[in-house]
């Protein structure tokens, strides 16, 4: 019965064609944690209880650990992450001239792993990459998102915006149907958020571990019964860039805690 009501609710959203063009940021901007139950917000705010902090601690160890043939650590180049990495995650994804492409934070970490440490890149959703990304992003907790658009990455941003408003999957839904037109409404036991990625990498109880924003985006593809893009695919990177710009001014809150 609940499944039938859920599908009916989604069908009613999909039948409303007037909201396809809504791609601008919602007003006022609200963090994903604002839509979580009080106990989740308390858990996220408590560094001793937040389960995502286990990965942050692991990332701190990896930051200092030599890697690759030349046995170089992240700290050898950047020093103390508590100083060198403040504000860095708030500026990603971004266009990187040396590589000639848009990189998210995971991509930048792997660029350094391969180029500076002469070590094989870390796999998406691997414990090491999640931990390092969480640790670097944690240094920017409380820093407002400030991803800039320029001419080089404008086509990627435009691609992300198109994907955000594009109906897809068997349910014929777009991101905007939930996170722009219906945020704040109840969907079964959850409250629909504005869809910002400022808490990722974040701990989700349904995963029982920390996960990346791309994992969460892929879950949305699965939810509307669409083909899921591969990790690191151009579509997911474009969506990440668009969402980061859309969240401009919202503070990072890594590691977020979600149901």
Place the predicted regions along the sequence by residue:
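Conserved short C-terminal alpha-helix that flanks the catalytic cleft of nucleotide-sugar-dependent
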Residues: 63, 163-164
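Post-cleavage N-terminal segment of exported redox proteins
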Residues: 2-5, 9-56, 83, 93-158, ...
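Short coil/turn and helix-start
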Residues: 68-69, 169, 230
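Short cysteine/histidine-rich metal-coordination sites, predominantly Zn2+-binding motifs
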Residues: 89-98, 191-200
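N-terminal, post-signal-peptide region of Sec/Tat-exported proteins
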Residues: 47-80
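C-terminal cap of thioredoxin/glutaredoxin-like
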Residues: 162, 169, 177-183, 199-205, ...
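Short Cys/His-rich "knuckle" micro-motifs
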Residues: 84-87, 185-189
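The canonical Cys-X-X-Cys-His
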Residues: 71-81, 132, 160, 170-182, ...
């Amino acid at each position: 019965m609940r499944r039938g009501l859920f599908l009916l609710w989604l069908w009613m959203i999909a039948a409303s064609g007037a909201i396809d063009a809504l791609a601008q940021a919602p007003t006022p901007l609200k963090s994903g944690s604002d839509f979580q139950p009080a106990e989740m917000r308390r858990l996220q705010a408590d560094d001793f209880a937040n389960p995502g902090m286990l990965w942050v601690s692991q990332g701190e160890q990896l930051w200092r650990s030599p890697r690759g043939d030349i046995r170089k650590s992240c700290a050898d180049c950047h020093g103390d992450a508590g100083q060198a990495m403040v504000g860095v995650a708030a500026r990603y994804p971004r266009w990187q001239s040396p590589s000639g492409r848009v990189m998210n934070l995971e991509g930048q970490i792997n660029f350094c792993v391969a180029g500076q440490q002469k070590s094989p890149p870390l796999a998406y959703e691997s414990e090491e990459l999640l931990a390092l990304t969480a640790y670097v992003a944690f240094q920017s907790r409380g820093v407002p998102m400030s991803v800039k658009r320029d001419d080089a990455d404008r086509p990627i941003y435009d691609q992300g915006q198109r994907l955000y408003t594009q109906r897809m999957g068997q349910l014929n839904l777009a991101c905007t149907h939930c996170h722009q037109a219906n945020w704040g409404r109840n969907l079964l036991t959850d409250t629909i958020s504005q869809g910002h990625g400022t808490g990722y990498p974040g701990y989700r109880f349904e995963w029982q571990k920390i996960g990346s924003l791309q994992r969460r985006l892929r879950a949305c593809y699965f939810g509307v019964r669409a083909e899921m893009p591969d990790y690191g695919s151009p579509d997911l990177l474009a969506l990440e860039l668009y969402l980061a710009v859309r969240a401009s001014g919202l503070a990072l809150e890594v590691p977020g805690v979600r149901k």
